[in-house]
Amino acid sequence: MIMKVFNTLTRQKEEFKPLVAGKVSMYVCGPTVYNYIHIGNARSVIAFDTIRRYFEYRGYDVKYVSNFTDVDDKMINEARKEHTTVGELADRYIKAFMEDTEALNIEPATLHPRATHEIQEIIDFVQDLIDKGFAYEVDGDVYYRAKKFPNYGQLSDQNIAELEEGASEHINEEEQSKKEDPIDFALWKAQKDDDEIAWDSPWGKGRPGWHIECSVMSTKYLGDTIDIHGGGQDLEFPHHENEIAQSEAKTGKKFVNYWMHNGFVTVGKKQEKMSKSLHNFVTVHDILKQIDPQVLRFYMSSVQYRRPINYSEDGLKQAETVLKRYQNTLRNLDARLMDEQETLEDSILRDNLTQAKAEFIEAMDDDFNVQNALSIMYDLTSNLNTHLQKNQVDKPALKKAKKLLLAWLEIFGVSFNEKQTENDDEIEVMVAKRDEARKNKNWAESDRLRDELQAKGIVIEDTPQGTRWHRA
């Protein structure tokens, strides 16, 4: 089957052809670590983790790099406000980010480089751009000559005149006096105050601009040309536009083959973008105190990555209901695999499995159409639940179905591994006593034991195949 990916650069779906057969190189812009990430930030992390997992499901070896921006204006301002250093602030929120993403079952990136650990490489990169005539220095600041790059504006589908008009409205007097053109952007920023974090450079003490950091880290760890560069739609311009200009000016090679951008998280009836500037955000750190991380993860994975997702309690409840359905199906499936009933081949179920697998791959190969894929998963559980009601089941087919469902759920970061606890043996004894009471029609004792089990958080299910239990 042909996998197709929507490329922001060309505004169309394209067949995915990796640079190296069987391998995928991915760079996804990570957070600026001056605070906890909010759910809008998490959308990108979850979306590209799901994409990465699907590539791995399809047999690709994925090298996934996602950076930490640990120095910029926001970092400096927040550190001053909290009377700490930029480095301490970064360490604190990188730790928080890793804890939040671990809770959401995000696979750690192959590499998580930090901008401040790449300063010499950044300086060398900037100097190369100056030597090639793509950059110039003014009073310790270094700017990129945007007009010199012939395709500037192509990614965001803007022409130079539009860009200049927009830039002129936002440029301050100091920048206007330094820049050759309003659309030029900073590669290196001179130190303004003695207490401001800075490094020695050929242009004096200063620090890197935001855009140059990702150009340096992506080319250093993945090469001059990479398969996929991802991030939120708000990074399309200026961040990713500037990355292209910097990287291709330096290397003379195509920077990225497939640009991918995820949609926003919106909130409320007006469906405003969730953002810190609008004060309408919820941090992952806070929301995970209230809901199961797996529910949030699944909810955020349930909409195709390019589409916006409107965050709501109803959406979370619906995601929780669907997850419980999958969990119950797998529990019932396990119970039937362990019962003593003889197996009976079911050609219809086997055909359903073959068809479902093909349709799931077809959906995900179409620019990661998770909505269609999840619909196929849901229909398969319906077929399985019907089959599980029969006196005799096709156990080889059920084993295959279990393996398939678990693999699909893993793509969405969902795992139902229920660890055995110390009192499981005690629960088994109580369930056996209740079964005995039911056989003897001692309904009072049966009800007493059921109530006692429920008080321990145990759910009892009486089926034709016997009693099943699980934790609520």
From Swiss-Prot:
Required cofactor names: Zn(2+)
EC number(s) reported in the record: 6.1.1.16
Pfam families listed in its UniProt record: CysS_C, DALR_2, tRNA-synt_1e
Main location: cytoplasm
GO molecular function: ATP binding; cysteine-tRNA ligase activity; zinc ion binding
Entry annotated with the keyword Amino-acid biosynthesis: no
GO cellular component: cytosol
Biological process according to GO: cysteinyl-tRNA aminoacylation
'HIGH' region, short sequence motif: residues: 31-41
Family to which this protein belongs: Belongs to the class-I aminoacyl-tRNA synthetase family.
Quaternary assembly: Monomer.
Record-given protein name: Cysteine--tRNA ligase
Species of origin: Lactobacillus gasseri (strain ATCC 33323 / DSM 20243 / BCRC 14619 / CIP 102991 / JCM 1131 / KCTC 3163 / NCIMB 11718 / NCTC 13722 / AM63)
Gene from which this protein is expressed: cysS
